[in-house]
Amino acid sequence: MCNTNAGRVNMVINHSAGRLAVGKFGWKAQVASLVDFSADALLNEMGITNPIFRTEVCPQGNCRALDFNPVASLNDDGRAVDELNNFMTLLAAP
């Protein structure tokens, strides 16, 4: 079986810039920028909403659990996204 996308550039939405861009990060280059990667990680791994990804993810698919969210507004003003982005930018290559 042949992969028809092998060797092709993956164009994805750069959420922080609001435009189409080349995917560079994440599984199969599905994220365009390290800022988007940081914001996505905060939301999906830790449940922290931020200016780039504002919508809560239903815990384990149970959206009724969001009724008990003590903070209905954004959990981060963008500072955590910037700090995580800076941390990953300054990490040395393995």
Write out the residue ranges for each language-model feature.
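Periplasmic c-type cytochrome electron-transfer domains
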Residues: M1-P94
